[in-house]
Amino acid sequence: MSTKIDGKQIAAEIKTNLAERVNKLKAQGIQPGLGTLLVGEDPGSMKYVAGKHADCQEVGITSVKKELPADASFDDIAAAVRELNEDPACTGFIVQLPLPKGINENAIIDMIDPAKDADGMHPYNLGELVLHVRGDISTPLPCTPRGVLELLDAYDIDLNGKEVCVLGRGITIGRTIGLMLTRNAVNATVTLCHTGTRDVADHMRRADVIVAAMGSAGFVTPDKIKDGAVLVDVGVSRVYDEEAGRYRIKGDVDKACYDKASAYTPNPGGVGPMTRAMLLANVVEMAERHA
């Protein structure tokens, strides 16, 4: 029987631990704070940011919110980033992406103080991840890849020497999880598949673990995986449900794969809650480093 990897449960346990650590920091006169910069009124982005602040309230982290209109200029956004860099109430912060059309997102991310980069996506912090194959890393780690590894660890899924096939090369998960999986502490062997990969299914069938992050609904089907594979579904697609008359979130892994797998993350309810929990963890760890 395959094991359902419950991201909601593990994220809840992590948040309980973080709340205890926040209380210890407060006893030392240190109040962790998460800042968010939201530009425009995209419903998805607004909902996501609201969820982050609800998480903050749950563990005792202060919310620092900055909002700009959709027609904000590059200079307006840059000024808001500088304000968050200098705000002592803000331990770490994120710039909610995507930014409005025409705004250079990479240039904005570059302006974030690496020590306040709650998403772990600043070039300096990614560089630290590239350089430090051994030992501990004291800089923030990308939230989604970290969440995946924490989730697998919570279920005692050993990745040492395992063949891991990563589907998708986006910076949020595909490229960065490869760096984390190949660190000495994890020691997996990684194949990164993308749009230029020949015979993706052949790579998938050899994998002990598949991390699907393509945004292609139901791409991973039973004929493409081996018996007993571990399936981690990070893909997000909005698919119209004719019966319900509305859009639903669907992952990259077809549910028909679950019986063939040894373990799987549902989607939604698998990796998503862990990504949010890791954002909080990054902020608490930033505060602890300055305690």
From Swiss-Prot:
Top-level taxon of origin: Bacteria
Keyword field contains Chaperone: no
SUPFAM superfamilies linked to this entry: Aminoacid dehydrogenase-like, N-terminal domain, NAD(P)-binding Rossmann-fold domains
Associated pathway: One-carbon metabolism; tetrahydrofolate interconversion
GO terms under biological process: L-histidine biosynthetic process; methionine biosynthetic process; purine nucleotide biosynthetic process; tetrahydrofolate interconversion
Keywords annotated in UniProt: Amino-acid biosynthesis, Histidine biosynthesis, Hydrolase, Methionine biosynthesis, Multifunctional enzyme, NADP, One-carbon metabolism, Oxidoreductase, Purine biosynthesis
GO molecular function: methenyltetrahydrofolate cyclohydrolase activity; methylenetetrahydrofolate dehydrogenase (NADP+) activity
Cross-referenced CDD domains: NAD_bind_m-THF_DH_Cyclohyd
Positions that bind NADP(+): 168-170, 195, 236
Entries under Pfam families matching the protein: THF_DHG_CYH, THF_DHG_CYH_C
EC number: 1.5.1.5, 3.5.4.9
Subunit structure as annotated in this protein's UniProt entry: Homodimer.
Classification via HAMAP family: THF_DHG_CYH
Protein name, as recorded: Bifunctional protein FolD
Species of origin: Bifidobacterium longum (strain DJO10A)
